[in-house]
Amino acid sequence: MAAKSFDVVVIGAGPGGYVAAIRAAQLGLSTAIVEREHMGGICLNWGCIPTKAMLRSSEVFHLMHRAEEFGLKATGVDYDLDAVVKRSRAVAKQLSSGVSHLVKKNKIAAVMGEAIIPAKGKVKVTTDKGIEELTAKSIVLATGARARELPGLE
């Protein structure tokens, strides 16, 4: 299979990567984005956004217990942790779908898989369907970061 050629290939579709890809496309550059898991990255899918959705549920729960301060009555106030988690996942999924929509709207080629850079200007992506080869004048690394694991904190 022949390599697909682009002006820019962005590796990583988190908040840095998808914004870089969208801007490149808006500037008229042929652009591809490679993501190994979910559009939007860790923050959108597993960290910041779902956590804030769960915190909002907690805030509402707290406010409901203070209803009488506002001249309201709320009896039998309780929570369902499974439903709270389900809502947080739904919020993340909706926003991830929004990122996918922006990628598509800006005519960015999205490739789901794990990327390596075997040579200058070349990106090899292992997808569910095999190996996909891309070439690019520029490659943007937007793979995010992971916290260092400290010995003894297992």
Indicate residue ranges for each PLM-predicted region.
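Glycine-rich Rossmann-fold phosphate-binding loop(s) that bind the pyrophosphate
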Residues: 12-15, 36-37
